[in-house]
A protein has these predicted regions:
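Generic detector of well-ordered alpha-helical segments enriched in charged/polar residues
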Residues: 37, 41, 45, 60-64, ...
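A boundary/linker detector
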Residues: 1-53, 276-277, 281-288
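Polybasic, low-complexity binding patches
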Residues: 88-100, 108-152
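C-terminal, charged low-complexity interaction regions
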Residues: 157-296
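Histidine-centered nuclease catalytic patch
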Residues: 49-117
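A broadly tuned preference for mixed-charge, low-complexity surface segments
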Residues: 10, 15-29, 119-132, 156-166, ...
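Generic surface-pattern signal
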Residues: 68, 123, 127-130, 146-155, ...
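Alpha-helix initiation/capping motif
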Residues: 37-38, 46, 59, 95, ...
Length: 296
């Protein structure tokens, strides 16, 4: 692999390192994979901006796991080989659990969009839904805010008021307990067998919460099933994300969140993730930290 042209001037540290590497690895002919190419591009970009980059947490293997995404979470368009990895929460930067794959068009402006700017842009877009704000339509700003909120530490009440316009991408670490609960409940409907699990889901909740949970869960399912028809019928994950834009779903979700504090949300997520779901693997934050401590 050849570094970008601006890095090939004589005396440039990237060129010097590249030339030393070529001499040391002259006999190696194995081509770089797409994940390795992206990893090197990330390291170079972080170095050029002076950003911290955790070599232990971010590896080509981690980036390869992001490639399960087939569509940009913001535009909804199919991702190609030129898709870019960006940090969800800019303040946390290049760390595992804070990375997502997006289209090049979104990546170009993503590094200038922090949480406050995203919220402000969404408010302006909501006020003028037919007008693009900062070059993006209302539906895209809703997804930007939804995605950024998942990796941005927020007050419990604020996190609980946000609709899940984007389901959590692979490998993202959700930092707000109420959104963990929101995501786990939504994902229950994204995999087969939800009908058999519905009763045990309700039983996981305290008795005082079960009625509100059932009203919310049934509303979310009904709205997801109403999304599109025939050839326009979306995949269930996309249908669930769209269902979160429904006023009835949000109103019933807010009734649930009014009765669930952060501690109870964590307890419920722990209960709900004990049983595996087909094709879905949920790792709790505490489990990750414990494994890292054992490996240290």
């Amino acid at each position: 692999m050849v570094p970008p042209a601006p890095c090939l001037w004589p005396g440039h540290p990237i060129r010097e390192g590249w030339e030393r590497g070529r001499r040391a690895m002259a006999r190696r002919t194995r081509p770089a994979t797409l994940a390795v190419t992206r990893w090197l591009a990330l390291r170079l970009a972080a170095w050029q901006r002076g950003d911290a980059f955790d070599d232990h947490q971010i590896t080509p293997q981690v980036l390869r796991s992001l490639e399960v995404a087939t569509h940009c979470p913001i535009t909804g368009r199919a991702l190609q080989n030129d898709a870019c990895v960006v940090p969800v929460d800019l303040r946390r930067g290049w760390v595992a659990g804070n990375l997502v794959l997006v289209s090049p068009q979104i990546a170009e402006r993503w590094m200038t969009i922090d949480w406050e700017l995203a919220k402000d842009a969404l408010a302006r877009a909501e006020a003028e839904p037919e007008t693009q704000v900062e070059g993006l339509p209302l539906r895209h700003w809703r997804r930007v805010v939804a995605l950024k909120s998942l990796a941005t530490p927020l007050p419990h009440d604020e996190a609980g008021r946000l609709p899940l316009h984007v389901l959590p991408p692979n490998r993202i670490r959700l930092v707000n307990p109420i959104q963990e609960l929101q995501a786990v409940l939504t994902l229950q409907l994204a995999v087969p067998g939800w009908g058999q699990r519905a009763r045990s889901l309700a039983e996981s909740f305290p008795e005082a919460l079960r009625t509100e949970f059932n009203l919310f869960f049934n509303s979310l399912l009904a709205q997801a099933l109403r999304q599109g028809h025939g050839d326009m019928k979306p995949e269930m994950r996309d249908a669930l994300a769209a269902a979160w834009g429904n006023e009835v779903v949000m109103r019933r979700w807010l009734r649930v969140t009014a009765l669930v504090d952060a501690a109870l949300a964590e307890t419920l997520v722990e209960r709900l993730t004990r049983e595996p779901m087909p094709g879905l693997y949920v790792v709790r934050h505490g489990e990750v930290e414990a494994r890292q401590a054992l490996a240290a």
